């Protein structure tokens, strides 16, 4: 249901097609989310698999689909706040990179996802961007062994004032797959808001990482709203008032 294929082989074919398409388009990098969660887990606030189990399964999947194929792009693994590679534990991140055989690899650090993961793990209670930047810098410092592999940043913020107990409360799942998907998507996006930054606090994170790529990954309903959100974020990062 999730990936419109009948089995694992069909899913692997989809990934290979995506990789081939990225190569044909001349992409400099491709992004893979190292995570696994179902609608039922999101709504019930539980996890069927540990971070390490998902990391090992992801690495095994990537090794199978990439083996024997040569691509010019860098493959970046992105952190999320559901089970998988969250960046909360540096040893798990190091394990992910060590298990993947594809040499041209790295990390895409998503600031909003990391804020959400820190909040869910009780490691970020501040409701200001300054406190969020401090918490992310602590994560970067803990990743000193693999910091050079953090090649990109998805720049945005999660909801810093949404009560965590509101996010984690159990919701009765709807009967149909489509309705359950809508329920879980609404829950996730309430926390993972992809909102523009309003201060220049995250410049310290950018300076500490010195990434090759920066993406202003902001939610919007229309292209005009997207452009305005990017403008606001750029203005904030320059130290100006929005």
Task: List the predicted regions and their residue ranges.
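Active-site acidic/histidine proton-transfer and metal-coordination neighborhood
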Residues: 1-106
């Amino acid at each position: 249901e999730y990936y419109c294929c009948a089995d694992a082989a069909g899913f692997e074919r989809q990934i290979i097609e995506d990789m081939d398409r990225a190569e044909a388009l001349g992409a400099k990098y491709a992004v893979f989310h190292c995570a696994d969660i179902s609608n039922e887990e999101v709504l019930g606030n539980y996890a069927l698999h540990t971070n390490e189990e998902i990391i090992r399964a992801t690495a095994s999947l990537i090794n199978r689909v990439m083996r024997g194929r040569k691509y010019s792009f860098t493959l970046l693994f992105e952190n999320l706040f559901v089970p998988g590679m969250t960046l909360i534990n540096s040893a798990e991140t190091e394990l992910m990179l060590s298990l993947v055989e594809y040499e041209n690899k790295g990390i895409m650090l998503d600031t909003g996802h990391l804020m959400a993961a820190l909040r869910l793990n009780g490691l970020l209670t501040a409701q200001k961007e300054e406190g969020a930047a401090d918490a992310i810098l602590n994560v970067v410092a803990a990743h000193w062994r693999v910091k050079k592999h953090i090649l990109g940043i998805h720049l945005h913020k999660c909801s810093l004032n949404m009560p965590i107990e509101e996010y984690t409360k159990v919701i009765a799942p709807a009967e149909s797959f489509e309705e359950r998907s809508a329920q879980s998507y609404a829950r996730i996006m309430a926390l993972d808001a992809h909102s523009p930054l309003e201060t220049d606090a995250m410049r310290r994170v950018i300076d500490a990482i010195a990434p090759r790529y920066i993406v202003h990954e902001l939610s919007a309903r229309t292209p005009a709203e997207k452009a305005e959100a990017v403008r606001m974020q750029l203005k904030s990062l320059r130290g100006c008032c929005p």
